[in-house]
Amino acid sequence: MIDSIKQKLEKLNPLNDSNKTKAAVFIGILYFDDYIESPEILFTVRSSKVSTHSGEVSFPGGKWEQADKNLCETALRESEEEINLKSSNVNNLGALNYLISRHDIEVNPFVGLITKKQDFVANDEIEKILTVPLNFLLNPSNLINQEIE
């Protein structure tokens, strides 16, 4: 399954730069033989104390800073700040095309395999850290399409 994800990411055609403020998120796939039997996706729940995205389920991430060499580094830096993710435990698989958020920010998702068990610790921006089995997310009977106005 991981090889299939990597192959699909390699085939993506990147979008042209949007010239908007940039941010990056990390889509972490936890999968290591000794601990997890099938891949799980790492999510966070944003704290009710933050001004944007309060209470939302999200991926760890944030805005690009000038000290960041690239947007992948932004995603990993923010993930370390928010949940104590060690970048040395990550095997970068690739990137998805960006989306423009409701706040008019270009959000760039990076997908990585978390290869070692580690303790995740939420900072004050994060209320909860959770994982969801990838098989659950891929099962059509678990999907609901709902239009929100």
Predicted regions and their residues:
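Acidic, negatively charged sequence signal
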Residues: 143-149
